[in-house]
Curated annotation (Swiss-Prot):
Pfam families: RNA_pol_Rpb1_1 (PF04997), RNA_pol_Rpb1_2 (PF00623), RNA_pol_Rpb1_3 (PF04983). The gene is rpoC1. GO terms for biological process: DNA-templated transcription. It comes from Prochlorococcus marinus (strain SARG / CCMP1375 / SS120). This is DNA-directed RNA polymerase subunit gamma. GO terms for molecular function: DNA binding; DNA-directed RNA polymerase activity; magnesium ion binding; zinc ion binding. In cyanobacteria the RNAP catalytic core is composed of 2 alpha, 1 beta, 1 beta', 1 gamma and 1 omega subunit. When a sigma factor is associated with the core the holoenzyme is formed, which can initiate transcription.
Amino acid sequence: MTNSNLRTENHFDYVKITLASPERVMSWGQRTLPNGQVVGEVTKPETINYRTLKPEMDGLFCEKIFGPSKDWECHCGKYKRVRHRGIVCERCGVEVTESRVRRHRMGFINLAAPVSHVWYLKGIPSYVAILLDMPLRDVEQIVYFNCYVVLDEGDHKDLKYKQLLTEDEWLEVEDEIYAEDSTIENEPVVGIGAEALKQLLEDLDLQEVAEQLREEITGSKGQKRAKLIKRLRVIDNFIATNARPEWMVLNAIPVIPPDLRPMVQLDGGRFATSDLNDLYRRVINRNNRLARLQEILAPEIIVRNEKRMLQEAVDALVDNGRRGRTVVGANNRALKSLSDIIEGKQGRFRQNLLGKRVDYSGRSVIVVGPKLKMHQCGLPKEMAIELFQPFVIHRLIRQNIVNNIKAAKKLIQRADDEVMQVLQEVIEGHPILLNRAPTLHRLGIQAFEPKLVAGRAIQLHPLVCPAFNADFDGDQMAVHVPLAIEAQTEARMLMLASNNILSPATGEPIVTPSQDMVLGSYYLTALQPDAVKPDFGDQSKTFAGLEDVIHAFEDKRINLHDWVWVRFNGEVEDDDELTSPLDTQILEDGTQIQQWTYRRDRLDEEGALISRFLLTTVGRVVMNNTIIDAVASG
């Protein structure tokens, strides 16, 4: 077995994101080749040679740093084939290995001057400003070379530690120091740029500052107390993670692997490249120029300007547009920085890591399924056959309908009646999970019993919509099939929609009728003002039972809001009913008929009920009958 085929399993307890020390950044990119040569530093802004189309050495796609661009082949072509594995070419210095190492091998750029990390400087809140207990504006003035900061006041009585000085003010101080009659022996020290910021952060003794803050907090209140607590919290986090504040200033920046920022040739011979390559190129160009200026001892003002430009180039690489002008490419389009790749809905985390496509899942538009029970959902046949395909194939073979998987797949493609019958058997008692993004609480994923339906839309019971915050204006939902018996049991016992009536947040019912259901119920039971109430005994409007009324309505012999007399021997409650009947009539056989506003009762001699007819509307009969059926079946 080759090394590439060996699968080493790493078991992680957790993933932690912390500040990286300069040594760690270097260790990511720096490697010692088998011949003892140390590689990793990217020093040239070039990407590929325009004639040979091969990566330039020490450039952004360098094969010596990142690995060969072709499997088992060095840059110059001296070594080819897998038999030379692990050899470093003595001519070009490229290690003979697989090209896929270019997906994970990193490089680094050694900066000629330190630069501040824009996330910690310009983030909200600004951690640099909080740690130094300085206004963000002052910190920015230092970093971007607008003001000097006093690092050591020396013997000068008018200067204070961390005081800001403009160019003119510092010149005046210098004149005082170097005047002939000056008594200052211990000269003050000032700094500017990220170097000065780094010095300030290095001077912080976190343990000592934390102790002072705790003492101050006990004796303060209001806004001052809140500010102190905020600073203490940041310092405590630095101490807990063993991170140093000066690590927020970078001496070297990592270069991500070249296959993660590719350069591809288009049909016309032109190249399309990742924006990161342009941003890295700007950093390398400015870094090399700064190193050259320092080498030739250029005037301070020129060096300082170059340092500021390097700072801005690194800012654009890390988070383009966070500060200053946004760097744009062709067509005035803003270049996509590292932050843009990571953050947002289309970013690496939400799109690729959290939003991965998984097997045994699908998604479709939801439509209302009014005939479904609450724990059921309508699953399109086309979707069900795909999701449950392995189960269907297994059952087809077990029932000797087909002999092998290939034959089973052909049968499934034809959508044979036997397949549909087997599919029906498979999904019987196999719950599925429905999820609607965004899943903001646990009821965003619930289990349902699938029912096969025609069409391509998932049918959903309207009562479960509030839990999903779903409506039927084009919303989509994802379907997942729990495979393991444990997962199916959990779905059935805990996640079934009919088991999630109450909101876990408030304890109040989350299954509440709304919109169409409320309007429909109102329309069904509403009274029509101009409807005529029939006399008792009217053959077309008097019925022997609730079912007869519904049959007459279905046959269109009566309308939904017509008044009817219907026989009903159950209990009746009416808040508007009078305390005594409107009229009582005693018949020859001793029975009596009581006439109320909305009912007519016939009682025997002892006052026991013989029969009862109610005056009601067809819609109310339908509503009542539906409730009785639901309670009886439940």
